[in-house]
Each structure stands twice: as C-alpha cells, then as structure tokens.
C-alpha cells in the first residue's frame, strides 16, 4: 500500500469523490442534510491544486485552501476501510507541514456540530474551538491550530 501524500491529478477525481462520499455518507441521517464535502466540485478542486491524496488505490483525501493568514482545511476524508490505520493522523500531520511550507502560522477548519467524532479528534490533535456559527441548515464549530 502506497501511503505517500501527493497532489491529486485529473485521473484521481472519481476516487476523490468516492472516498469523500464514503467518509461522509453516514452523516446524512444524523445531520439531516448532505454534508458540504459531498457537494463540492471535486474536479474544480483537483484542477486548482487544492486536493491531496494518499494510497493506491486512494483511501485518504485532503482539500486545502491557502488563505492570506492561514491554511484552511476544507475537508479531510478517509475511506471506511482505512479507518483506524493511521491515515487520518498522517493526513493531519501533512496539513501542518504544508502550512509551515507555505509560511502560514495556523490551520483553520470547521466541522458540523453533529459530527461528534470529528470534534474529539481535532481536540486530540491540538486544535482549539474558536466559535460556533449557524448558516442556513449548517451548524458548525470552527477550530484552529497554530503551527
């Protein structure tokens, strides 16, 4: 199994969608809406250089957006088959490395208030809760981590 993390290419787009959908699908019943990462334009994100993948076949996906003062972790997805194998940890470590490479002082992300597992994970990895916002049907917790 290849665990290098690399920029996604056009031929990865279907796998990016498949892994993202598999990682988030079970939340639909819990939160009552399709999670935002499942609605993303994966082809556009890949073309813009925002997507990084790991595995052959792909079993981990990151969508990263560099901003002026932080790196925004738009989404992180691990296939159900790869859960518990350290893929998520390696992806989060990569996010921090990428922020440092870009000279950005922190990583920011948000997660749905009903995604309890994610909240525990981010706190475990040193992210701090900054605020909670409600926009339409999305109730979100915002986190940051200084790197």
Predicted regions and their residues:
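Conserved glycine-rich acetyl-CoA-binding loop
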Residues: 79-93, 100-102, 113-120, 124
């Amino acid at each position: 199994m290849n665990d290098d993390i690399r920029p996604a290419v056009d031929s990865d787009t279907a796998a990016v969608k498949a892994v993202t959908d598999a990682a988030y699908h079970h939340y639909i019943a819990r939160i009552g809406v399709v999670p935002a990462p499942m609605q993303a334009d994966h082809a556009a994100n890949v073309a813009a250089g925002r997507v990084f993948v790991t595995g052959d076949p792909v079993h981990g996906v990151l969508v990263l957006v560099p901003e002026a003062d932080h790196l925004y972790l738009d989404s992180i997805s691990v296939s159900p088959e790869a859960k518990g194998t350290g893929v998520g940890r390696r992806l989060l470590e990569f996010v921090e490395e990428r922020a440092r490479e870009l000279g950005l002082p922190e990583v920011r992300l948000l997660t749905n208030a009903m995604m309890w597992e994610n909240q525990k994970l981010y706190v475990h990895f040193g992210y701090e809760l900054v605020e909670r916002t409600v926009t339409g049907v999305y109730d979100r917790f915002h986190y940051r981590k200084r790197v």
